[in-house]
Amino acid sequence: MRPTLSVPLISKTIRLPLILVLVSTFSTTALAGAAEQKIQGLWVDNKDPSRQKFAVMVEDCGSKVCGSLYWLKKPLFANGLPKRDKHNPNEALRERPLCGLQILTGFQAANDALWQDGEIYNPDDGLTFSSTMKLSPEGTLKIRGYVGISLFGKTLEWVRPTEEITRCK
């Protein structure tokens, strides 16, 4: 019969503090990585470049955050003229070009990963919705548009572009 070694590699008095230090270190590192991500910059509506329809440039607007259409897959009508904000409920604004149109307004940072009290404008139907934006640990931007309360809404998920995108004109 072979003798067995019964001496633990790490004594019980050291084991728990060591585990706590390791967990704390990894948790802090993960949180720091999420906090280093910025909402500002370019976002596209789909991971697959062949399915992308638009890109939005998110930037600081004073003490708040806003975003404008930066690129459109189809920026022109069939007649070659630039697409306009033709569904806007305000007739005076219907001739604005979609390219460069501000569609995200008034977002205030609640913390490093959440922006609230904003609005998102949908030029496809001319409707404006209350909105929040959340930056996920995976690096996606989740925009929730809703009427009244957030429960009754829709969430869009945007990603950073993987290919170079040229600003529309």
Name these PLM-found stretches.
Residues I39-Q40, D45-S130:
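Central antiparallel beta-sheet cores of small beta-barrel/beta-sandwich binding domains
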Residues N111, P137-G139:
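Residue-level recognition of beta-strand termini and adjacent short loop/turns
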Residues V147-K169:
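Edge beta-strand at a domain terminus
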Residues A30-A34:
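Boundary at the C-terminal end of the N-terminal hydrophobic targeting segment
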Residues C66-S68, K142-R144, E157:
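Soluble periplasmic/extracytoplasmic beta-strand elements of cell-envelope proteins
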Residues A92-E95, K142-I149:
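Short aromatic-glycine motifs in intrinsically disordered, low-complexity regions
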Residues P17-T29:
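Bacterial N-terminal signal peptides
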Residues R2-L18:
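Bacterial N-terminal signal peptides that target proteins for export
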